[in-house]
C-alpha cells in the first residue's frame, strides 16, 4: 500500500526535522552510503565522498512514511535530498551543478 500525503503528519515532520538536525550534512537517499540503490543517490554520495564531506545517509526505502513525507516536507518531488546545516540544498542535479561550479 502506497502512502500519499498532501499534508504532512506532525509526527512524521518531527521525525524528519530530528534527522535533519542530527548532523551538519544529511542525505535522504535510496539505499545506504555504502550501497546506494539508485543512480541518483549514488551520484550524490560520490560527490560528497570525493570532496571529503562527512554525512549521514537516511535510507528512505526502509520507511515509507519518511520516503513520502520528505517530499512533502521539502516540497521537492524526488529523492535524493541533501540538507546542509538544516537547509535543503536540492537533489542530484543541483548537487552535481554545485560541485561542477565550485
What are these regions (language model features)?
Residues 6-10:
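Short gly/ser/thr-rich secondary-structure transition/capping motifs
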Residues 1-5:
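Short, Lys/Arg-enriched N-terminal segments with co-localized hydrophobic residues
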Residues 49-68, 77:
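Thiol-based oxidoreductase modules, predominantly thioredoxin-like and allied folds used
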Residues 12-14, 67:
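Eukaryotic intrinsically disordered and solvent-exposed regulatory patches
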Residues 28-30, 58-63, 85:
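Structured beta-strand/turn binding interfaces of compact recognition modules in eukaryotic regulators
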Residues 84-102:
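Non-catalytic, surface beta->alpha helical segment in thiol-disulfide oxidoreductase systems
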Residues 47, 72, 98-101:
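Rhodanese-like catalytic fold shared by cysteine-dependent sulfurtransferases
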Residues 16-54:
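Local sequence-structure signature of Cys/Sec-based thiol-disulfide redox active-site neighborhoods
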Amino acid at each position: 500500500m502506497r502512502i500519499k500525503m498532501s499534508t504532512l503528519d506532525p509526527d512524521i515532520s518531527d521525525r524528519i526535522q530530528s534527522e535533519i538536525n542530527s548532523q551538519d550534512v544529511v542525505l535522504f537517499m535510496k539505499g545506504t552510503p555504502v550501497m546506494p540503490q539508485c543512480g541518483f543517490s549514488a551520484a550524490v554520495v560520490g560527490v560528497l565522498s570525493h570532496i571529503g564531506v562527512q554525512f549521514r545517509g537516511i535510507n528512505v526505502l526502509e520507511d515509507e512514511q519518511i520516503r513520502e513525507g520528505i517530499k512533502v516536507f521539502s516540497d521537492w518531488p524526488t529523492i535524493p535530498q541533501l540538507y546542509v546545516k538544516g537547509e535543503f540544498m536540492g537533489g542530484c542535479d543541483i548537487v552535481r551543478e554545485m560541485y561542477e561550479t565550485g
